[in-house]
């Protein structure tokens, strides 16, 4: 019941209509050196990454709707999440996340509901899910960070970023809810998270207690789902998981239904008008001159009956479970395990080059210690050249010629004689030990 109250409280604030903003990850612009790349421009960014740079991967989180409410939603474990790559070689760090556009509210209710001349309704939506990459990690915004993997190369990061557009193309709409069956006990709350992740190919096995009775009809498509898909992708590409005492926590909102959701025929005027009535009531809750408590109570009743979900252009009718119609959890979630298969990761063709270091400056190819030794060697060579050049000019002014122009000729000759081979001596032969030579 506590989980249900948490999610209803979250939705109460959403439907009051106070969040007409995007929940994208960072704030910044190209003017201060911060650049934003979406799925269709990521390839412009990948070739700025050096193949041999070393990275660590972090799970980063920010309180939901931080720009308006600060850390308020942190109190109920409601977070926006992403992935952060920290460059260990001094290059730019990288953050990437998946968010609802234009706003989170637009993923829940239609943009417009209009009525035609015959009194029939039409619903239009403006919602999408968008991946955003930034060459910067805003540590004020991403207030929670947890190390997940290490030993990543720049090449693996580029391969991952080339996978991200494929993910966005297959997840074009932000879907807040998973839809699952209620289990045999009617609670619908046991093992569903493990089952969902297992269906996505993440985690070592099936669900926990009760999952054998659970059917997942529809997976969500949220920021956390993108993060866990990212963990799996990086793992398949060769990332090394750190030793964690427990798996990182994941937000999950699930609607539990008593039977399989049915697709609503939008072309059926009767069914379309029922859809419109549902969403009009939903939006009307926020427009009523009522207290937050009254809105809260109306939303509770809303989640105890017939419910409609709009997912990627399709409407679904759900009959929600009475004991537990909805669940909002924030709990440890399985990480990828088992044998890796980098060939299972689909990437965008021609999105990155494996030889980007050819386009880097000379010194960017070496570590700091190597640069120090190279600098010393170059400096020593310059000193020798100057010494010989000045010495030749001085000796020439003294009337010397030929090899006598070389400064300190006797010194250089004696050094050279140390390495001169004596042709009168036998060549070195290794001493072979046998019974006669060993006394």
Curated annotation (Swiss-Prot):
It is found in: Membrane. Keywords: Glycoprotein, Membrane, Signal, Transmembrane, Transmembrane helix. Residues 1-24 form the signal peptide. GO terms for biological process: lysosome organization. Pfam families: CLN5 (PF15014). It comes from the Eukaryota. GO terms for molecular function: hydrolase activity, acting on glycosyl bonds. Glycans are attached at residues 93, 112, 122, 138, 168, 219, 268, 289, 304, 359. The keyword Glycoprotein applies. This is Cln5-like protein 3. It comes from Dictyostelium discoideum (Social amoeba).
């Amino acid at each position: 019941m506590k989980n249900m109250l948490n999610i209803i409280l979250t939705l109460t604030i959403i439907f009051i209509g106070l969040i007409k903003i995007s929940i994208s990850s960072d704030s910044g612009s190209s003017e201060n050196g911060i650049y934003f790349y979406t799925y269709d421009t990521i390839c412009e960014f990948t070739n700025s990454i050096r193949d041999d740079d070393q990275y660590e991967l972090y799970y980063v989180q920010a309180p939901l709707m931080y720009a308006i409410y600060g850390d308020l939603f942190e109190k109920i474990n409601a977070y926006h999440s992403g992935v952060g790559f920290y460059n260990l070689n001094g290059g730019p760090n990288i953050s990437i996340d998946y968010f609802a556009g234009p706003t989170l509210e637009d993923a829940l209710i239609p943009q417009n509901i209009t009525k035609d001349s015959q009194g029939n309704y039409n619903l239009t939506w403006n919602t999408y899910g968008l991946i955003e990459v930034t060459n910067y990690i805003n540590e004020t915004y991403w207030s929670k960070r947890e190390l997940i993997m290490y030993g990543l190369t720049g090449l693996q990061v580029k391969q991952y970023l080339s996978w991200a557009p494929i993910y966005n193309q297959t997840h074009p709409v932000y879907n807040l809810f998973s839809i699952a069956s209620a289990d045999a006990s009617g609670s619908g709350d046991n093992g569903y998270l493990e089952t969902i992740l297992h269906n996505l190919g993440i985690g070592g096995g099936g669900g926990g207690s009760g999952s054998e009775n659970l059917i997942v009809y529809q997976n969500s498509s949220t920021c956390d789902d993108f993060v866990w898909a990212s963990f799996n992708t990086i793992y398949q590409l060769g990332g090394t998981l750190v030793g964690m005492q427990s798996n990182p926590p994941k937000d999950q909102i699930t609607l539990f239904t008593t039977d399989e959701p049915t697709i609503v025929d939008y072309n059926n005027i009767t069914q379309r008008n029922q859809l419109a009535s549902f969403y009009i009531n939903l939006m009307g809750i926020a427009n009523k001159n009522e207290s937050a408590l009254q809105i809260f109570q109306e939303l509770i009743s809303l989640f105890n009956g017939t419910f409609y979900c709009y997912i990627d252009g399709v409407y679904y009718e759900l009959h929600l479970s009475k004991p537990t119609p909805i669940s909002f959890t924030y709990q440890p979630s399985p990480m990828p395990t088992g044998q890796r298969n980098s060939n299972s990761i689909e990437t965008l063709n021609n999105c990155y080059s494996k030889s980007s270091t050819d386009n880097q400056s000379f010194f960017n190819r070496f570590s700091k210690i190597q640069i120090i030794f190279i600098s010393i060697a170059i400096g020593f060579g310059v000193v020798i050249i100057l010494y010989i050049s000045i010495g030749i000019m001085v000796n020439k002014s003294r009337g010397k010629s030929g090899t006598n122009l070389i400064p300190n000729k006797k010194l250089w000759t004696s050094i050279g004689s140390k390495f001169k081979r004596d042709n009168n001596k036998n060549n070195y032969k290794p001493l072979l030990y046998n019974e006669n030579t060993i006394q």
